[in-house]
């Protein structure tokens, strides 16, 4: 079989995903030998109760499984093994990760400029953006803000359509969606799936998990993969699923939504709810029975008399030996053996690096300027603290008794002011979420993000440092003059930028805000402690604290430069009469342990080098996760599978859990059930 140009056929065979347990317990199977395929012009719906493995299957197909799970089996695209992350396929996650300060039109426009070919004119890109807005039904909310913690935004259905719009801009041949109708009302859910129907009709392959669709939504699906407990209950054409359930002895009643019936047959939560209701009634009436519960609730559903585990096991067994399974296996084999046109691995973006840098910097700057919690609140706090510092150290003077006051003021500026950068960690975490989503979908590269993040934050850091330095220098009466003011500002800018680079590096490795704040606060605390203010450099323990910590400490170099900038060339009054004034250079050397012969610009250069080092480390961490981690995980998977496959508990299937119940009969022969098949 040969594929049409641009079409993507995806097939998976014997897909098993497990969470290894190297102790005495059994290994947990998230997926167990699942087979299936997705084709152009068709929507494949992956259905099942919560915990059935829907999201796990999508993550396995898209190459986004967590690091603590291992996968076996084959995933083939047009007959070849290939990775489907970083732009090869689009993936709309269940969580709508968006920049809440942008409008709908701005979000789509920036994404279009980041990814569409550079040869397109601005007018052509604008036409594509407007067409996408129209196709997704976003005209009414196109100029409204998406919304965040302080801005009211668009509805959940509009956010979901926007998430889909961002991924279909470049017309990907393969689209994955994780529960796109979750949390939506029936009308919004139908509209979203109708959009997917239109996308599939244009020759695209759409694979979507869905929890419990309405009858109207279910009718839009071409194929159905029904999962329960990580196993396949049914795979084939969606319209044939009702017939299979009827042939298996569990026909769908005429007035019931087919998807509701399918989930009722395989969802064990119904048994748990029934058992809980019976137990609660027995507390007041010891003779209360399950039959009485059915009578009091007026239910005529014969499924209530049969444990769900038995129904599920029967369906799984009957599907494996059914004609539906044989037909699906033949189709999967046909798709897996495709020859001819093989889709080349391509990037999700088709524009050049410099345009991406400009657009991404502009978008990030706008986001920072509109988010009050990113920089504006911190700038306000910095101004208030600067006024407090200025009033406490007001006109500190040049008396010998004020030498330590000058050092304390400089230490506070270099220490606590940089420590305040941790206040923006929540914004860093949110930005990293957006980056992770866009990077996995191939919107842009790691290098352009690393540089653009630095460039977009600089104007706010400069404003922050200018306001802080202007207030403190004027009120404390530090050395006046353009060069001293310029150095003071530049020293503070470099120190704060270095800390923010460190925070971004931490945000790239920690999973949540709390862990990031703990690590960031601990790290900055160590840097402040060894910066040379709380204990001067000559008094620091030589092992570890002096060498090497103080030499790789941005705070130590920034504080040295600040002391030199203030004290060199200044004379302090002597404590004794007729004794010459003390030079600032002498105080630097004898009291603070700082070599005055070393240029303050050298200290600033070292801070800049540490800043660059943090940015390179940030880049290296992101690249490691992208390039090296998959290789390490592949080796881990091979070794883990070879280990757990030797265990009898892994090879042995879970025993039938409900032997105490009587053997059930076909529901079509039971009284009170009206099946549309008869």
Swiss-Prot record:
<dbReference type="GO" id="GO:0016020">
    <property type="term" value="C:membrane"/>
</dbReference>
<dbReference type="Pfam" id="PF19055">
    <property type="entry name" value="ABC2_membrane_7"/>
</dbReference>
<feature type="transmembrane region" description="Helical">
    <location>
        <begin position="409"/>
        <end position="429"/>
    </location>
</feature>
<feature type="transmembrane region" description="Helical">
    <location>
        <begin position="446"/>
        <end position="466"/>
    </location>
</feature>
<dbReference type="InterPro" id="IPR003593">
    <property type="entry name" value="AAA+_ATPase"/>
</dbReference>
<dbReference type="InterPro" id="IPR043926">
    <property type="entry name" value="ABCG_dom"/>
</dbReference>
<feature type="modified residue" description="Phosphoserine">
    <location>
        <position position="658"/>
    </location>
</feature>
<keyword id="KW-0812">Transmembrane</keyword>
<feature type="transmembrane region" description="Helical">
    <location>
        <begin position="490"/>
        <end position="510"/>
    </location>
</feature>
<comment type="similarity">
    <text>Belongs to the ABC transporter superfamily. ABCG family. Eye pigment precursor importer (TC 3.A.1.204) subfamily.</text>
</comment>
<dbReference type="Pfam" id="PF00005">
    <property type="entry name" value="ABC_tran"/>
</dbReference>
<dbReference type="InterPro" id="IPR003439">
    <property type="entry name" value="ABC_transporter-like_ATP-bd"/>
</dbReference>
<dbReference type="GO" id="GO:0080172">
    <property type="term" value="P:petal epidermis patterning"/>
</dbReference>
<keyword id="KW-0547">Nucleotide-binding</keyword>
<keyword id="KW-0067">ATP-binding</keyword>
<dbReference type="GO" id="GO:0009651">
    <property type="term" value="P:response to salt stress"/>
</dbReference>
<feature type="domain" description="ABC transmembrane type-2">
    <location>
        <begin position="355"/>
        <end position="567"/>
    </location>
</feature>
<feature type="transmembrane region" description="Helical">
    <location>
        <begin position="602"/>
        <end position="622"/>
    </location>
</feature>
<dbReference type="GO" id="GO:0016887">
    <property type="term" value="F:ATP hydrolysis activity"/>
</dbReference>
<dbReference type="InterPro" id="IPR013525">
    <property type="entry name" value="ABC2_TM"/>
</dbReference>
<feature type="domain" description="ABC transporter">
    <location>
        <begin position="10"/>
        <end position="254"/>
    </location>
</feature>
<dbReference type="Pfam" id="PF01061">
    <property type="entry name" value="ABC2_membrane"/>
</dbReference>
<keyword id="KW-0472">Membrane</keyword>
<feature type="transmembrane region" description="Helical">
    <location>
        <begin position="513"/>
        <end position="533"/>
    </location>
</feature>
<protein>
    <recommendedName>
        <fullName>ABC transporter G family member 13</fullName>
    </recommendedName>
</protein>
<dbReference type="InterPro" id="IPR027417">
    <property type="entry name" value="P-loop_NTPase"/>
</dbReference>
<dbReference type="InterPro" id="IPR017871">
    <property type="entry name" value="ABC_transporter-like_CS"/>
</dbReference>
<keyword id="KW-0813">Transport</keyword>
<keyword id="KW-1133">Transmembrane helix</keyword>
<keyword id="KW-0597">Phosphoprotein</keyword>
<dbReference type="GO" id="GO:0009506">
    <property type="term" value="C:plasmodesma"/>
</dbReference>
<dbReference type="GO" id="GO:0080051">
    <property type="term" value="P:cutin transport"/>
</dbReference>
<dbReference type="GO" id="GO:0140359">
    <property type="term" value="F:ABC-type transporter activity"/>
</dbReference>
<dbReference type="GO" id="GO:0005524">
    <property type="term" value="F:ATP binding"/>
</dbReference>
<dbReference type="InterPro" id="IPR052215">
    <property type="entry name" value="Plant_ABCG"/>
</dbReference>
<feature type="transmembrane region" description="Helical">
    <location>
        <begin position="374"/>
        <end position="394"/>
    </location>
</feature>
<feature type="binding site">
    <location>
        <begin position="48"/>
        <end position="55"/>
    </location>
    <ligand>
        <name>ATP</name>
    </ligand>
</feature>
